[in-house]
Amino acid sequence: MRSRQLHNVSEDRETLSRRNKRSKTSLNGHIPIDLLIEIFLKLPVKSIATCRSVSKFWTYVLGRQDFTELFLTKSSSRPQLLFACANDNGYFFFSSNQPQNLDENSSPIAAYPLTHVPKSRDLGPPINGLVSLRGERILKGRIRPVDVSIIYNPSTGESLTLPKTNMTRKKIYTVTSFLGYDPIEKQYKVLSMNMSYEKHPKCEGYQVLTLGTGKLSWRMIKCCLNYQHPLKNSEICINGVLYYLAMVNGSSWPTRAVVCFDIRSEMFNFMEVYRELSYTTTLINYNNGKLGMLMGQEAHKTISGICRSFELWVLEDTVKHEWSKHVYLLPPLWKDAVANTRLYFAGMIGTSEIVLFRPDEPLCVFYYNIDRNTIKRVGIRGLEAFKYFRIFLNHVENVKLF
């Protein structure tokens, strides 16, 4: 009995010690910060966005970098599929759990509504749960809306409107913007390129904006390529390097190539690929760290039932530009499962599951397993009202607020 009492006293002292240690991190008599963080980590991301408006103290806690990183780490352990459905009113975002280990009788995917961003276009892939897009917004000091870049959080509906880029008024431009992230410096940057169309399309100005540094402003940078025409919806950011497809000067005429932009150094580089890139070339994050390229047969702009094979190229050495090439022959079932459906590569889950989709039919996606050489059609529920969509793999929820 005496021993049990001593044991209870010891436990009480340990509990009191933890509480005293925890209370040291509180401010002005509020609930201790680390206890609040533990509670907030259990809330859904939409609830966290609502909690920002409760008090200045909660806003402070939810804006701390340690909380943001903890939440992102937790979210990364359960990646999702992100659906972006477009119509005349902008983008409508949906999400669902990312299927793992698909079996023969795979159930339909249920897409749950997230948020809506009006009057928007040119959507880029999510970077740590944030996306870049363009839209017309009324900036401070202006009466009419102007075309600007926007950083948007599909999970919370929060957005950040960026200032208008600098450009020469005498010329007609369109602007292409890509979002990137440097995991070492933990910085988000936006690369913007002004496209001129006087004789033929080309970039005439490169600008960079760093997020989270106070005042938002664009800085002019130089590019080593004397001609390039970036292809929209082709970009991907891996380990602090932004890769995208572009038309660049070849030996005799422009050719498709992979352009690299280092987020930290803000330097461009040209990636040599000893093969002409086909219309179906899609950049992917292979095995969570390597640049990969999925390509169908050169004669086709999409993947359909008549295709017999496709290629997977993996960048093995970023300095020497050495690639490994893998050719996959599609199974006989491919022709019956896909038929005349025109598909696009969405990306790759892990090292074996390739996901394909048809943009104008948000009713299903296709999973091709390169190890088992099998193809599965999986239905989608919840997107029936839309006629166009895009799908992004390995999406994570983020509570970042700049």
Curated annotation (Swiss-Prot):
Domain F-box: 26-73
One Pfam family matching this protein: FBA_3
SMART domains: FBOX
InterPro entries hit by this protein: F-box-assoc_dom_typ3, F-box-assoc_interact_dom, F-box-like_dom_sf, F-box_dom
Annotated region described as Disordered, given as residue ranges: 1-23
NCBIfam families in the record: F_box_assoc_1 (TIGR01640)
Entries under PANTHER family matching the protein: BNAA05G37150D PROTEIN-RELATED, F-BOX DOMAIN-CONTAINING PROTEIN
Name under which the protein is recorded: Putative F-box protein At3g23960
Organism: Arabidopsis thaliana
